[in-house]
Amino acid sequence: MPPRPRFDRRAPVRELPNINDRIKYPQLRVVDADGTQLGVINREAALEVAQERELDLVLVSEKANPPVCRIMNYGKFKFEQEKKAKEAKKKSHQTEVKEVKMRYKIDQHDYEVRINQATRFLKAGDKVKCTVIFRGREIQHTNLAESLLARMAKDLEEQAEVQQTPKREGRNMIMFLTPRKTPLIKNEKEVTTSAKAERTIS
């Protein structure tokens, strides 16, 4: 019986960035930190310039002839690239409409579960459709459903704004919430405290 193939469980080798001594090309086209073209110089001279400026020599275009390097603060450059990637990912998030369903006769525990669900959706950047479902003659109590949705909007006001106030939709009562873009100042006391703090700082 042939031996069973072995699976390599080792973690994949992490590719290291081409900077400083890892750059092996003898001739390089070098761009200074301020964008000035230093022209084509040998590797040793390029490294010496980077060291004099207490910066890094970073390979930015390996396919060019000769390869192009830039003198920069690599740590800062990497941080900015990661920051831009995170922002791009955040902007690419497709807003969805998540639904939270309940009956107008809801106990406190179940209500808190719905509040937690809505909070999670809002923090993820999604809109929330709050739906109160009526059964049979319960449709006569739309006022209670409106009160429940108003209570929900109040409890979520720090995370959400009401995009659409409660209204009938078939045999349901619905309300739409959207993530709050600006922080909520609850009352005059907070406004006064905030103003005093600003005057103290200035």
Curated annotation (Swiss-Prot):
Keyword Cytoplasm included in the entry's annotation: yes
Primary localization class, coarse: cytoplasm
Pfam families the UniProt entry points to: IF3_C (PF00707), IF3_N (PF05198)
Localization per Swiss-Prot or TrEMBL: Cytoplasm
GO BP, one annotated term: ribosome disassembly
Gene Ontology molecular function terms on file: ribosome binding; translation initiation factor activity
GO cellular component labels: cytosol; membrane
InterPro entries: T_IF-3_C_sf, T_IF-3_N_sf, Translation_initiation_fac3_CS, Translation_initiation_fac_3, Translation_initiation_fac_3_C, Translation_initiation_fac_3_N
NCBIfam families: infC
Subunit architecture: Monomer.
Its job: IF-3 binds to the 30S ribosomal subunit and shifts the equilibrium between 70S ribosomes and their 50S and 30S subunits in favor of the free subunits, thus enhancing the availability of 30S subunits on which protein synthesis initiation begins.
Record protein name field: Translation initiation factor IF-3
Organism: Prochlorococcus marinus (strain MIT 9211)
